[in-house]
Amino acid sequence: MQNETLQNWLSDGPLLIDGGWGTEFQKRGLPLGAHPDLWNLENPDAVKAVAKSYVDAGSDIILTNTFGSSRFVLANHNAADKIAEINRRGVELSKEAASEAVGRNVRVLASVGPTGVMLALGDVSPEEVYDAFVEQIEAQKAGGADGVVVETSSDPQEMALAVKAAKSLGLLVVASGTFDSGKKKDRTMMGATPESFAQAAEEAGADAVGSNCGRGIETFVEICSRMTAVTTRPLWMKGNAGLPKMVDGATVYDQTPEGFAAEALKVVAEGASFVGGCCGSNPAFIAAVRAALDAR
């Protein structure tokens, strides 16, 4: 399916993405502070189980446990020598889960997160960052990824390098920013607005643009509206389950699955072609969105 276009994917209407992965890993025993991507090699059954839980909840698209699998991030966990293996296996595990869907086609987009290095401060060169993305995405393609999502982006320059790396390898790519900074909480950490981010993503060659994380799903209607004003690319929206609160030392989110689903429908009505969940969401939230979409 690596030769498909997003228009083929969207022929039957909006597509449902998966939800959060981190808390699902913690439920399965991932220690706080441990790097989840290492589980692709150390605990693959748990990784596949999380992916399968979203397939069973009704996701049309699931991601991969590769968000922090660039050479820069893995070096912090003494795993830089396992880049290819971790990325390839992460995709393979999601593909295995997707293949178990009954009577429908579930696609897999490989997750590519920020490198953690600062281009603006001269920590590394753009060429080094681009090469790191090519290295990561090559392994994801080898694992069978149907495309890539460059997510939780704050730096449009880094995002553009990742998009161009994916396109150089012939893959579909979604560019997704996180807008929770600034006086109005509507900019990325590096100051990009939804409009400027969407324009930069389109110029870099992204097949779809959007947002994930940062704030609750209820704030994503505005992000949709602002991006629609400047781009005709399909919109990808993956919001959090409301606002986080500390309860007995643990972070909990204040949204219910039903409330989340109602907000997700508003995001779709505003023009989103892809909708799902991020922090605080789980398979119950995605199942609720599935039911709401099917009942329209």
Q: Which residues does each PLM region occupy?
A:
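Domain-level signal for soluble alpha/beta catalytic cores
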Residues: M1-R296
